[in-house]
């Protein structure tokens, strides 16, 4: 569980230019065994192409976004087949778009937890190292205490799910992005 870098270049969400891959590999003697590629960089790729590009460029694994897996209709058995062919590790990034674990709206908060659970089940099926979760955000400015309490409640539920399903969870430290 020694992931030190996960590459995610939002400006290149549809492809990874070869020059970027080569630059990352060559600069400063980076240890490629510590670098995973975010699957969103290869949004339009099929699973085989995704595995092939990540492997061919010397990376150690894929940070698979559950939202992408579900939206693109990827197949679990196909993923496992490719995982057996390519020596790449997998970690899963939980669904996070349009969700908020700290929402004042109970329905949104409950659906957010359900989406994390679906992501966690996917991570278990894919034998992923862990599941990364976004912490949510304040619905209204100035309601920090209430938001923190709601987030704590959500994370306690996620912790119980983690114990039951058997997938480790990491909480991602977020930069300030509206609605993230």
Task: Give, region by region, the residue ranges found by the protein language model.
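Short intrinsically disordered, low-complexity coil segments enriched in acidic
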Residues: 1-6, 12, 175-178
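N-terminal pre-domain/capping segments
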Residues: 4, 8, 15, 22-124
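A generic alpha-helix propensity feature with a strong bias for hydrophobic helices
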Residues: 13, 20, 25-26, 138, ...
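Active-site acidic/histidine proton-transfer and metal-coordination neighborhood
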Residues: 105-180
